Amino acid sequence: MSEKQVFSTEWAGKTLSVEVGQLAKQASGAALIRYGDTVVLTAAVGSKKPRPGDFFPLTVNYEEKMYSVGKVPGGFLKREGRPSDRATLTARLIDRPIRPLFAEGFRNEVQITSTVFSVDQDCSPEMAAMLGSSVALVISDIPFEGPIAGVDVGRIDGKYVINPTIEQAEKSDISLTVAGTYDAINMVEAGAKEVSEEAMLEAIMFGHEEIKRLCEFQQQIIAAVGKEKREIELFVSDPELEAEVKAASEGKMKTAIKTEEKKAREAAIEEVKEEILESYKAKELENESEILSEVAHILEMIEKDEMRRLISQDKIRPDGRKVNEIRPLSSEVGMLPRVHGSGLFTRGQTQALSVCTLAPLREHQIIDGLGTEEYKRFMHHYNFPQFSVGETGPRRAPGRREIGHGALGERALQYVIPSEEEFPYTIRLVSEVLESNGSSSQASICGSTLAMLDAGVPIKAPVAGIAMGLVKLGDDYTILSDIQGMEDHFGDMDFKVAGTKDGITALQMDIKIDGLSRQILDEALTQAKEGRLHILEHLTSTISAPREELSAYAPKIITLNIKPEKIKDVIGPGGKQINAIIDETGVKIDIEQDGTVYIASQDQAMNRKAIAIIEDIVREVEVGEVYTGKVRRIEKFGAFVELFKGTDGLVHISELAHERVGKVEDILKLGDEVTVKVIEVDQQGRVNLSRKALLEKKEQPEGDKKPQAEKKFYPKTKKPESK
């Protein structure tokens, strides 16, 4: 495969080409994907020998290059650093549909790297990378039960669209990524605007039709350039040893698994395992470490099989619940006195404390990535400390799992967040998982809903989330509501659904089997809705609506609209004016280019004072209006009166009174308050005022009247006569 070969098809109205044989030839498999003007190189490498351990060491990397969008990276070094959240989420998105398609017992290390070379914003580099990952694997000698493909699906005015453009995505009420094989779906990730279960299912199946076509396209590539798959040694337990361990432990393991409380159940299972392992240690076998490792693996498989058999055949779960039963719920708001909003949500032995923080819009998150989004004002972060599962370990920066769970919660809540116009705040939610026995990401969504309501955020509707599970033995399957950790670990599916009472706002599905049929998806969505509505009813019994007032410790933000041409007046030369307002009131001021002014402070009185100052600065004088101002300067020809901050006018000496005035000081003194009427604003914007226009004129006998002095105002600019 030394010569370049190109395979082309159409994808969502754009040309898709796969190039192999020219780049990254030392990798086990590599493909350059051209989708429109988006270009992504994916290379896959598999180790020749198994790696020690009882897991499959698969690593998926997605590398964003800033040159792909014509940008220079920020920061001092001016080069790409740690992956962005979007890159991390994309790597997870690719990993999830690929991982189930490696054989059970495969222990060779596999690494897949997708590098983004060029980005056309209307041609998703993420979907190109997913396709490239599949192609790189299927044409390599790495054993892989693909191909797979993934597509984005949108819905505009009821019509489904594959790989929507940026413009189409803005109009769509569904943002769905679905992946799978020709036969079945094995990964779903979605955000939505309260869509029905039926609409979401239709979107998933619509996407699967396109996935089938892309899988057929890859079969053509495999036929032309695919390598023969290498022979590998899968980890398989010794049949005699397996039978021996089963005979000694099956009954005890079944009893231990039925222990309802998590910690007690874990202790009971551990006791069974220790008893069996100790019996083999006592035999003092020659290859003891290898035997003990194999026995430990067999015991875990027995634990898995017994749990699955209990659920599938007896329809009983380890904690004694029915298959559609939700664990006991409890919740509380306002636990933390100084934060802006807090919510504690507990479901069984899973507990999340969510905190809402409000800030001025200037504190939004700046996005320096490959997409068109420049900033976001709503964030949800998820933290999972070791103590939440009763374990010790180092505390590191958020990993892929924490970033992924935080993003899922953010997607679930995004639709109900009020617009900037309705609520001009940056909103940050942090969910601290304090206990975990499954479904902690969904607990964080419920806790975040409580925290926002407690903070007074006017969300469109409360949102709740639930995690569904599946145990499938042959053609028989059992769908589980509100799965706990053990059911997640040994089950076949983790299907998370979040939404309001009116529809779905987020959905995420990962499976460990080849795929799911439409029937199973339909039943899982229906059962998830029942659970979601039950949880929503509980949440609204704790707090049914946003608090009417924000926390005393939250910034109070007032908006004011001014003419864009007045912005310079508010800012002043070198920022002098705006800094003076900030110094005087202690507020924070942000001004948008359209003239929207945001004023933020914990003290509403200072907010109002800042508003009054700005209103005075941008206020325009109108002829005929009456003002009360202070005398700021006196000249021989009249007095200058400050009408409001930044604007003054001249009361000519002849406009002070109806009778003749000899000296200005006879009527007005410096600092006097005087009520005046605007009689003229000249072409240069200078304001002429009159005091006498507001005074009653005294009647005089005809003979006593004296000729009036000539009125002198600011000179008007005379236009030159045209010749």
Swiss-Prot record:
What's a single GO CC term here? cytosol
Pinpoint the S1 motif domain residues.
624-692
Task: Check the record and name the PROSITE patterns matching this protein.
Answer: KH_TYPE_1 (PS50084), S1 (PS50126)
Which cofactor does this sequence's record say it needs? Mg(2+)
Keyword terms: Cytoplasm, Magnesium, Metal-binding, Nucleotidyltransferase, RNA-binding, Transferase
Q: Which GO terms describe its molecular function?
A: 3'-5'-RNA exonuclease activity; magnesium ion binding; polyribonucleotide nucleotidyltransferase activity; RNA binding
Where is the sequence biased in composition, kind Basic and acidic residues? 693-723
Q: What's the family?
A: Belongs to the polyribonucleotide nucleotidyltransferase family.
Name of the protein in its database record = Polyribonucleotide nucleotidyltransferase
- Upper lineage: Bacteria, Bacillati, Bacillota, Bacilli, Bacillales
